[in-house]
Amino acid sequence: MKNILIIGCGLIGSSLLRSIVEKKIVKKIFIYEKSKSNIIKIKKLKLPCEVISDFKKIIPNVDLIIFCTPLSEYEKIILKINKYLLPKTIITDVGSSKEKSMELIKKKLKKGIFWTSSHPIAGSEVSGPEHGVKNLFHNKWCILIKERNTNEKHLRALSKFWKKIGSRVAIMDSKKHDTVFSMTSHLPHLIAYNLVKTATDFEKQKNYELIKFSAGGLRDFSRIAASNEIMWRDIFFNNQKNISEVIDLFIKNLLSFKKDIQSKNNKSIIKKLINTKKVRKKIIKLKQDINKPDFGRS
């Protein structure tokens, strides 16, 4: 690869930029960013890239295009770049929900052009190019989506690319991806948002300074609840069916805990608590533990 175009230079886009430069993967990196404030930050930070405003001259000369925007931005951008795309160009994204976005891409992308979707399991509650870090993807999973019409050559090239920046690569189809991450990432984020809302509602109801005394649990959940609201709205809406199913399962288990507490069912609640500890041990054994809780960043 000689040239890469990153569309969207927030946390993920700027971290990719830094990582690509660190690993010396390509000669030139182009950035397309619609936010004027982000463009100012990119220039102030002196990030090693060329910020572009026009796709026409650039797209035919890039080897890889990476969408690092919210899911709701995909359609507009595809329509802008479609006529300049070449079959040789590898196109990917870093979105956290796949089935609906892949359906949209199939409808809007011109014939003969291939899109191979990626999902690096990395992130932070902060956003913007000033928060990007070069080692964000190091030793983190990156899921590549393989469908019936996936271009195998592009898939291999993307796998090689993500491994070069330090990611561990796994391959699955979009349906399995959305099912898995509805539970491991999307539900934990939804719980975080709702826990913080519950805490603020409870504080108003009791008229206590509750937030002031946040313990580790609420503090860590509040960090996740500070994540970008547009990005997470898009994820919730795009993975609506799977998320709704895991919400129902969560409510069922929450009510079961409530019943055990109200009836002081010692045997049942101890069994539940022990079983959840086993999952924690498994996470540590699989080396999925980190110093700073991130509740399945995506």
Ranges and model annotations:
Residues 3, 27-28, 114, 141, ...:
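Residues at the starts of beta-strands that form the adenosine-phosphate
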Residues 207-275:
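Interdomain hinge/lid region at the active-site interface
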Residues 134-220:
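Internal alpha-helical scaffold of NAD(P)-dependent oxidoreductase catalytic cores
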Residues 68-70, 95, 146:
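Glycine-rich, N-terminal phosphate-binding loop of Rossmann-like dinucleotide-binding domains
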Residues 56-85, 89-90:
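Rossmann-like NAD(P)-binding element
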Residues 1-60:
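NAD(P)+-binding Rossmann beta1-loop-alpha1 motif at the extreme N-terminus of oxidoreductases
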Residues 77-130:
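Rossmann-like NAD(P)(H) cofactor-binding subdomain of soluble oxidoreductases
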